[in-house]
Curated annotation (Swiss-Prot):
This is Basic phospholipase A2 beta-bungarotoxin A2 chain. It comes from Bungarus caeruleus. It is an enzyme of class 3 (hydrolase). One of its GO terms (cellular component) is extracellular region. Pfam families: Phospholip_A2_1 (PF00068).
Amino acid sequence: MYPAHLLVLSAVCVSLLGAANIPPYPLNLINFMEMIRYTIPCDKTWGHYADYGCYCGAGGSGTPVDALDRCCYVHDNCYGVAENKHKCNPKTQSCSYKLTKRTIICYGAAGTCGRIVCDCDRTAALCFGDSEYIGAHKNIDTKRHCQ
């Protein structure tokens, strides 16, 4: 191997080692976005669901406006159980899963944080795929509609 190749290989390895110290915060969000993209219609992106209804996005209050918003309500509650009952941190918890044959398979032992969070995300993503997206419910006035 040429010295230049060794130099490049070394630089790549050092870069990868440095990347291993990146906090896992975005990892679960990336996993969840990937699950959503797998289950929703092609003309939508996960961003369509980020500020939808009363519960899709940050926070949530009131009564869900439709079936899709109920998916987010259930997901929020699932994360709440993961945090309060199981002492998991859903936003930073990595998980193992497989996208196959129009479904999502979560791996890991039942009751572990990775599996609990994966099951929350899987259920929500499949629910998104089964629910109608109503454009009028995107960016609604939550002070008016979500009391």
